[in-house]
A protein has these predicted regions:
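Conserved alpha-helical scaffold segments that buttress catalytic/binding sites
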Residues: 1-204
């Protein structure tokens, strides 16, 4: 959080790379202080709403839960297809702050509704690469079938860039497979696209 604060103080856009998704709560801390409200745009296979995982409150499985410890943070998640029973009560209790576009409902996603949800908001984008379908992104610690494909992912990011103010981003959970460079290039291009769309439509 101290590094992102220094970057913000210089009025530079912070793009942070994990490592684990557990970096995100620290990454957003300076934005929580700067803005009255922050909308976390979250791409992932997992909800990451556990209170703790193996006794660790700041686990990758608790990343979004820790972000929601900040009372001015709301979450819109895309691609979720794995959630534990322990996360369900918290999700139900906080349904006013958490909106999930479930992977199983992809054909019914209402992206016009999403556009309205983020309109003119300050958005922080966090992308766990296991949100992508395992057929195009097996190079991650917990790959899952049934996820996001390339073009639909870019479409969501582009809608966000056009209709909100993306203030920062992180991309995480790449676990390279020796000899298979295409997955590394995919993540590099994802970062390039996030930055390109953000600055193409950047609001002052």
């Amino acid at each position: 959080s101290k590094i992102n604060q220094k970057i913000l103080d210089k009025k530079i856009f912070p793009m942070t790379f994990g490592g684990e998704h557990s970096i995100t709560p620290g990454c957003i801390a300076p934005f929580v202080k700067k803005h009255k409200k922050i909308c976390l745009l979250h791409f992932d296979a997992h909800a990451d709403l556990r209170e703790s995982y193996n006794g660790e409150k700041f686990s990758h499985a608790s990343a979004i839960r820790r972000c929601l410890d900040f009372k001015n943070v709301s979450v819109i998640s895309f691609g979720i297809r794995n959630i534990s029973k322990d996360e369900i009560p918290f999700l139900k209790k906080n349904k006013q702050r958490i909106n999930i576009f479930w992977a199983k409902d992809k054909s019914d996603w209402d992206l016009k509704k999403f556009k309205k949800m983020i309109k003119n908001k300050n958005v922080y984008l966090t992308f766990d690469v296991d949100g992508l379908d395992s057929s195009i992104m097996p190079a991650t610690g917990t790959p899952e079938p049934g996820g996001l494909l390339w073009d639909e992912t870019l479409n969501i990011i582009k809608i966000a860039a056009k209709n909100s103010n993306i203030v920062g981003a992180d991309v995480n959970e790449l676990s390279p497979i020796k000899g298979f460079n295409s997955y590394n290039f995919l993540v590099a291009k994802l970062v390039y696209k996030i930055l390109s769309y953000t600055f193409e439509f950047k609001r002052k």
